[in-house]
From Swiss-Prot:
It comes from Haemophilus influenzae (strain ATCC 51907 / DSM 11121 / KW20 / Rd). This is Uncharacterized protein HI_1403. InterPro entries: Phage_lambda_Stf-r2. The lineage of its organism: Bacteria, Pseudomonadati, Pseudomonadota, Gammaproteobacteria, Pasteurellales. It comes from the Bacteria. GO terms for biological process: symbiont entry into host cell; virion attachment to host cell.
Length: 182
């Protein structure tokens, strides 16, 4: 019998009838354990976190791993990607800050976002701005320049008193260069 099994292993085939094993013709411990290099007896396992090379995964383990992969993909598909353009539906909360390389555009509908935005917020090394548009026409831009100037529609805004005092005293009076002083 041992010679017969040895011959089968050399031929890279091991065919054993279960009834032959049950009848007691030979002991199961005479058959080698299967490895990556040789045929033999394999232990089945339903574990999905095993890295064993001497155990084979059952269909239950494969299904569990597959279900977890599908769940992870579904979760990942619901996340905002780091690259490319995406449409985001629903409300998103950002706990930290939003960093944009060029500018931030805000619109209340995709229709206006594609034609022109209601509000365009931007900044560069020279200034920052809030630009308001309606029907793709600029209504006005409030701009803070790097030198500290504040302008609206390209006209400098002057304050009659210090901003901090004006806000706390609620006496803020604003006028532009076009308005005549009284």
């Amino acid at each position: 019998m041992k010679a017969f099994l040895h011959h089968l292993q050399n031929e890279a085939k091991l065919i054993i009838s279960l009834t032959y094993c049950v009848d007691g013709e030979f002991a199961l411990n005479e058959i080698a354990r299967a490895t990556l290099q040789q045929y033999g007896i394999v232990q089945l396992s339903s574990a999905t976190n095993s890295d064993s090379e001497t155990e084979a995964a059952t269909s239950k383990a494969v299904k569990t791993a597959y279900d977890k992969a599908v769940e992870a993909k579904t979760t990942a598909d619901g996340k905002v990607g780091l690259n490319g353009n995406e449409s985001i539906n629903g409300e998103k909360t950002f706990e930290n800050r939003i960093v944009a390389k060029r500018n931030i555009r805000i619109s209340d509908s995709p229709h206006y976002a594609s034609r022109g935005d209601y509000l365009n917020i931007g900044a560069n090394n020279g200034d920052c701005w809030f630009e308001y548009k309606l029907s793709n026409q600029e209504i006005g831009t409030l701009r803070m320049h790097a030198n500290g100037d504040l302008t609206y529609k390209r006209q400098k805004i002057y304050l009659k008193m210090d901003c901090w005092q004006a806000i706390h005293k609620r006496k803020l009076k604003v006028f532009t260069a076009k308005r005549k002083k009284r």
